[in-house]
Amino acid sequence: MTHSPLAQFDIKKLIDIKMFGFDVSFTNSSIYMLLASILALTYFYLAFYNRKLVPSRLQVSAEIVYNLVADMLNQNIGVKGRKFIPLVFSLFIFILFCNLLGMTPYSFTTTSHIIVTFTLAILVFLTVTIVGFVKHGLRFLTLFLPHGTPLWLAPLMIVIELFTYLARPVSLSLRLAANMMAGHVLLKVIAGFTVSLMIYLKFLPIPLMMILIGFEIFVAILQAYIFTILSCMYLNDAINLH
């Protein structure tokens, strides 16, 4: 029997839990998010628990990741962005480890589900909105009226800018989920063809499969970066009212 390429995204209950009328069951998605968090914490613990003047390769790799996120905030927000390093760094690492964990055979890609990515996007959206109002008060609403807009065009621009602002969590979450799902479906389909082709071409299709896996790993890293850089840009709008 041929399995559907979409079967890999099925949510399966492991522990059925009902709380206050809500289904909060522990699923395969839950366990892989927990596993990604544990792996991330273990990685950074091993990298930094015994820091040395001459760093190990593990410490160097962890410092590169940290500096990457710090540079993103610095380039987009400036010095004011340093206080958001814990939030943005946690987002980047969580998404990165979830994406990469999903590349292992017979695993589950949590970031291919819109409910997971939308939750992360809503976290960014609420943070940006709260920071904007706390820092600027009602002046934050000027974000919806670009500077220099003619008075007669102001109502239309406000509606457009407000719609664009409210659409941010949707576009942010859909981009990540769609890319991760599309990549894994493509790999599943091509892997099926590769097995069939090996009957006639022996091991020749394997290099092609390895290239595609390498490309998908690149996409997994890139999508974590894109989600994070867009989060930094949204924070910049709230802090500097651009």
Swiss-Prot record:
**What PROSITE patterns is this protein classified in?**
ATPASE_A (PS00449)
Q: Does the keyword Cell membrane apply?
A: yes
* Cell inner membrane keyword on record: yes
Q: Which residues cross the membrane?
A: 29-49, 84-104, 114-134, 140-160, 189-209, 210-230
Which controlled-vocabulary keywords does the entry list? Answer: ATP synthesis, Cell inner membrane, Cell membrane, CF(0), Hydrogen ion transport, Ion transport, Membrane, Transmembrane, Transmembrane helix, Transport
Annotated Gene Ontology cellular components are: plasma membrane; proton-transporting ATP synthase complex
First and last residue of the signal peptide: none
> What's one Pfam family here?
ATP-synt_A
Q: Which GO terms describe its molecular function?
A: proton-transporting ATP synthase activity, rotational mechanism
Q: InterPro entries recorded for this chain?
A: ATP_synth_F0_asu, ATP_synth_F0_asu_AS, ATP_synth_F0_asu_bact/mt, F0_ATP_A_sf
Q: What CDD domains does the record point to?
A: ATP-synt_Fo_a_6
Its membrane topology: Multi-pass membrane protein
Top-rank lineage group of the source organism: Bacteria
Where does it localize?
Cell inner membrane
Q: How does it assemble?
A: F-type ATPases have 2 components, CF(1) - the catalytic core - and CF(0) - the membrane proton channel. CF(1) has five subunits: alpha(3), beta(3), gamma(1), delta(1), epsilon(1). CF(0) has three main subunits: a(1), b(2) and c(9-12). The alpha and beta chains form an alternating ring which encloses part of the gamma chain. CF(1) is attached to CF(0) by a central stalk formed by the gamma and epsilon chains, while a peripheral stalk is formed by the delta and b chains.
| Stored NCBIfam families | ATP_synt_6_or_A, PRK05815.2-4
Function (record text): Key component of the proton channel; it plays a direct role in the translocation of protons across the membrane.
| Protein family according to the UniProt entry | Belongs to the ATPase A chain family.
Note the PANTHER family from the entry. Answer: ATP SYNTHASE SUBUNIT A
Q: What is this protein called?
A: ATP synthase subunit a
